[in-house]
């Protein structure tokens, strides 16, 4: 990625995943997000680039930080933002995703942000509506804006991503965050490791250009970044780990395990955290943690994504789906 010129133009209509984005597309979004940070840090947190545009947030899975982040991002760009409460909607009365999509499409929104438990839901929605679609997480498939905000956090702390050793640890099997991060970090030249018990590793990891470890000591050795994943017990139908106590003993990030990584290694977590399950509180709140910075970068990245998709100066013709 060294010495390549990054275009300010983003040639896609949707953001459905990291897969389908080129390294230069990713850098375009990260560079724009760098600019958006200043907006969020000024007293008047507002710009009018999307004034008159309408954003609908359609969350079929519970979310606090992601939905709030998308809402703030849209409002700071000047868009009109509507949060659809699925719990009180026609979906609960038997309406299908397609029916809901067609109804919302008739209202002429400019962008739909969707989170859904089914992999491929965002892509299906994009085929049925006339506006841009952003995937805010679809099952265990992808979570592109999380990977982008993680990359932005790493780049701002370390100055680069290329050649860094990034260890992604924990429940990789059920994690859309892990999948999107692996795709993005590989695209930008990082050395990616996954660290997990064999029961929490998906099939086909060898095809994703990662090093696989079942030991935290081996997996964290000389790591520049340690990215912990939440143990997603709500997605587990069987017995994937013997007990929470045993899981933390072997795979929870505490001070002793963190010593295996480089002394200046970053500690990351996409949230929400299970303290005492995958990460100890003194590590989550410690000097190497950039978890709160990830939250701040989330708003900037989502601002960048929506501006890149909807601002005609950055997306003439609203491009092709990614």
From Swiss-Prot:
Entry-linked HAMAP family: Asp_carb_tr
Catalytic activity: carbamoyl phosphate + L-aspartate = N-carbamoyl-L-aspartate + phosphate + H(+)
Keywords: Pyrimidine biosynthesis, Transferase
Molecular function terms from GO: amino acid binding; aspartate carbamoyltransferase activity
Phylogenetic placement of the source organism: Bacteria, Pseudomonadati, Pseudomonadota, Alphaproteobacteria, Hyphomicrobiales
Free-text function comment from the UniProt entry: Catalyzes the condensation of carbamoyl phosphate and aspartate to form carbamoyl aspartate and inorganic phosphate, the committed step in the de novo pyrimidine nucleotide biosynthesis pathway.
Binding residues annotated for L-aspartate, in chain numbering: 93, 176, 230
Superkingdom per UniProt: Bacteria
Residues that hold carbamoyl phosphate according to the record: 65-66, 115, 143, 146, 271-272
Pathway where this protein functions: Pyrimidine metabolism; UMP biosynthesis via de novo pathway; (S)-dihydroorotate from bicarbonate: step 2/3
SUPFAM superfamilies: Aspartate/ornithine carbamoyltransferase
One GO CC term on file: cytosol
E.C. designation(s): 2.1.3.2
NCBIfam families: asp_carb_tr, PRK00856.1
Quaternary structure and interacting proteins, as annotated: Heterododecamer (2C3:3R2) of six catalytic PyrB chains organized as two trimers (C3), and six regulatory PyrI chains organized as three dimers (R2).
GO biological process entries: 'de novo' pyrimidine nucleobase biosynthetic process; 'de novo' UMP biosynthetic process; amino acid metabolic process
Pfam family for this entry, one: OTCace
PANTHER family: ASPARTATE CARBAMOYLTRANSFERASE, ORNITHINE CARBAMOYLTRANSFERASE, MITOCHONDRIAL
Protein name, as recorded: Aspartate carbamoyltransferase catalytic subunit
């Amino acid at each position: 990625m060294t010495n390549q010129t990054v275009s300010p133009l983003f040639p896609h209509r949707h953001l459905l995943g990291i897969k389908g984005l080129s390294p230069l597309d990713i850098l375009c979004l990260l560079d724009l997000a760098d600019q958006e940070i200043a907006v969020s840090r000024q007293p008047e947190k507002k710009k009018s680039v999307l004034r008159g545009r309408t954003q609908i947030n359609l969350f079929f899975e519970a979310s606090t930080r992601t939905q709030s982040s998308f809402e703030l991002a849209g409002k700071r760009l000047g868009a009109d933002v509507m949060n659809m409460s699925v719990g009180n909607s026609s979906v609960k009365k038997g309406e299908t995703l397609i029916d809901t999509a067609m109804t919302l499409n008739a209202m002429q929104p400019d962008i739909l942000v969707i989170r859904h438990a089914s992999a491929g839901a965002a892509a299906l929605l994009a085929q049925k509506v006339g506006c841009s679609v952003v995937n805010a997480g679809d099952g265990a498939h992808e979570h592109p804006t999380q990977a982008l905000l993680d990359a932005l956090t790493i780049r701002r702390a370390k100055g680069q991503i290329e050649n860094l050793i990034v260890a992604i640890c924990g429940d990789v099997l059920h994690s859309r965050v892990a999948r999107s991060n692996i795709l993005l970090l590989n695209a930008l030249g990082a050395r990616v490791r996954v660290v997990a018990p064999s029961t929490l590793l998906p099939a086909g990891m060898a095809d994703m250009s990662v090093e696989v470890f079942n030991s935290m000591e081996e997996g964290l050795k000389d790591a520049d970044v340690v990215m912990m994943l939440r143990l997603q017990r709500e997605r587990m139908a069987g017995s994937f780990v013997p007990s929470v106590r045993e899981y933390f003993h072997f795979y929870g990030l505490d001070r002793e395990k963190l010593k295996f990584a480089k002394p200046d290694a970053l500690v990351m977590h996409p949230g929400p955290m299970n303290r005492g399950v995958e990460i100890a509180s003194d590590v989550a709140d410690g000097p190497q943690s950039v978890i709160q910075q990830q939250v701040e970068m989330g708003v900037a990245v989502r601002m960048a994504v929506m501006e890149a998709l909807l601002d005609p100066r950055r997306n003439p013709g609203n491009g092709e789906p990614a």
